[in-house]
């Protein structure tokens, strides 16, 4: 009961976002979403809302990606998780330029757009593994062109079907 109450309070009210905004963000995160389902939470995307933005985070415990999108009609912030692929498929099927309304109702993320109403089950956001980043003193900046060139020059050494992901 306590766990359910915590989830209900995570996103108290609601927010709106354009279809194109959330589809773009979801497409970027899907590449990292766990496909093998070793832990159910890894097939979910972490949804964090503040006064003007929606942050989506996905991880497979080796990599993590976060995207930020602009929202409208914000009422209050919070966070929850929802199945990434189902959310992406649902949003992609909505009409172009549709404004999508998201709100939490108990353990369900409710999604409304036009006359369509949809429900997705959620998992507690506290269960979602998030990487802790250290101070970025060793950070470097590199242009996308230079990074692409470096990867192309070393890609010959990658294994094609090696199950040891750290070697690829």
Indicate residue ranges for each PLM-predicted region.
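Single conserved hydrophobic/aromatic residue that forms the stacking wall/gate
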Residues: 1-11
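Structural preference for solvent-exposed beta-strand-turn elements
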Residues: 12-168
